[in-house]
Each structure stands twice: as C-alpha cells, then as structure tokens.
Amino acid sequence: MKSAFTLSLALVAVTATISAAADDNCSFGCLDVYKPVCGSNGETYSNSCYLRLASCKSNNGITEAGDGECASTPASSATPSPVTSSTGSTSGTVGCPDMCLDVYDPVSDENGKEYSNQCYMEMAKCKGTGYDDNKRSGNPGISTLDAERKLAFAPGYQGPPCGDMLCPDNYAPVCGSDGETYPNECDLGITSCNHPEQNITMVGEGTLPVTGAATATATATAEVVTRW
C-alpha cells in the first residue's frame, strides 16, 4: 500500500515537472494582428502565432489547416488566454483585433470605403466604427509596429519562422554563448531563433568584457583623449 502511494506521488511530481517545463517553453506572446487561420482541431485562431501558442500549451501538435476562419468554429474560443508582455499589455483578446501593422495595402469594403489594409477593415467592421487610425494619420509606414514593440517570443524559441518576433526596447544587456552582447534577452532569443544551428544561449548578464586587441585599442583611445 505504501509503495503504491509512493508511486502515485512520483507520478504526480513527474506530471507537474512536465507541465512546468511546457509552460516555460510556451512563455511567449503574439501580436494582436488579425489574420485568422484555421487549426487542424477545427478551431479559428487570430493568427498563426496564436495557433502555435495553443499547440505549444496543449502539446497536441495543432497545425494550420488553412487561411481564414474555419467553416464552423466551436462556441469556445480557440484563442489562448491573454499573455502579458514585458510592457504590461495583453494580447489574444477574443473578438476584435486591437492593433494592425501599418502596411499600406489599400482595400475597399462593400460600400466603397477605403482602408489602409485588410486588417484595418476587419477591425472597423468588427467594432462597427468604420474608423481607420492608420488612414487618418496619413502614415503608410511602420510607425505603429515600432511604437508597440510587444514581446512576441521567449528567448531561445526555435519554432517556425521568426519573422513575426518583436522585442521591447529596454536596454538590459546580456552575453551570448556566441561571444556577442545583445541589448536584452529577447533580442538574443531572436538571433537564436534565426540561427538554430548555432544554439546560442545566454551565458551571463551585462556586457562582455573587453579583451585582447580590443582592450589595447580602448586603452590607446583613452590615453589620446586624456592627452588631448
């Protein structure tokens, strides 16, 4: 009886460990860009990043079955619970998209009203406003993308293409195993994602010490400045 109880505790501990590891590996957020995709589980996700997040958290291997909303989406939303970014904002809000990329690719609705891109049109329809922030600003650039800088993926993520990964602008330098200093841990993670063959990991906080020739150069420069 005692052995059975001990075995049960061990199984619970293993399950908890696996669950905690899964949560750590899935600690990334996604941009609130509304570009719906249909999952292999028959549920609709706000975009492919949210599908990957759901797949990661559920460990069910959910894949994209197609672009756009599924023919019939279950009553319960497929979008994961909101993920808090480093800036304190949340993403994954069920329903209307909260932001769109400032990419100028004009489209018109059935009434002939023009929008900066498909996402802004979908947002306006969803919220029932007919309002296009990007179009009113007259800026077809990527200022919103630069301004938001929402955390998109955790460091070391080596999943699908890294093109939709963004990091906050905070300066908290870290040292990489490749001998480079990165502005913050998230930036190191993006490089690791883009170059999985290098298996770049964080080896410490702060900037890398200046050594060798670099030290000599820095010293010589300091001496010149002092003499000047």
UniProtKB/Swiss-Prot annotation:
Q: Which Gene3D superfamilies match?
A: 3.30.60.30
Under what conditions is it induced?
Expressed in zoospores. Expressed during host infection.
Q: What is this protein called?
A: Extracellular protease inhibitor 10
Q: Which PANTHER family match?
A: FOLLISTATIN, ISOFORM A-RELATED (PTHR10913:SF45), FOLLISTATIN-RELATED (PTHR10913)
Instruction: Give the keywords, sorted.
Output: Disulfide bond, Glycoprotein, Protease inhibitor, Repeat, Secreted, Serine protease inhibitor, Signal, Virulence
The answer, when asked if S-adenosyl-L-methionine is one of the entry's keywords, is no
One Pfam family matching this protein: Kazal_2
Annotated region Disordered: the residues are 69-92
- Can you say where in the cell this protein is located? Secreted
Residue spans with biased composition (Low complexity)? 71-92
Annotated disulfide bonds: 26-56, 30-49, 38-70, 96-126, 100-119, 162-193, 167-186
Q: What is the lineage of its organism?
A: Eukaryota, Sar, Stramenopiles, Oomycota, Peronosporales
Q: Which residues form a coiled coil?
A: none
Q: Name one GO molecular function term.
A: peptidase inhibitor activity
Assembly description: Interacts with host subtilisin-like protease P69B.
What are the residue positions of the site described as Reactive bond?
32-33, 102-103, 169-170
Extent of the signal sequence = 1-22
Q: Which GO terms describe its cellular component?
A: extracellular region
Briefly, what is this protein's role? Secreted effector that interacts with and inhibits the pathogenesis-related P69B subtilisin-like serine protease of host tomato. Inhibition of host proteases by a pathogen extracellular protease inhibitor forms a specific type of defense-counterdefense mechanism between plants and microbial pathogens.
Q: Which organism is it from?
A: Phytophthora infestans (strain T30-4)
The positions flagged as glycosylation sites are 25, 199
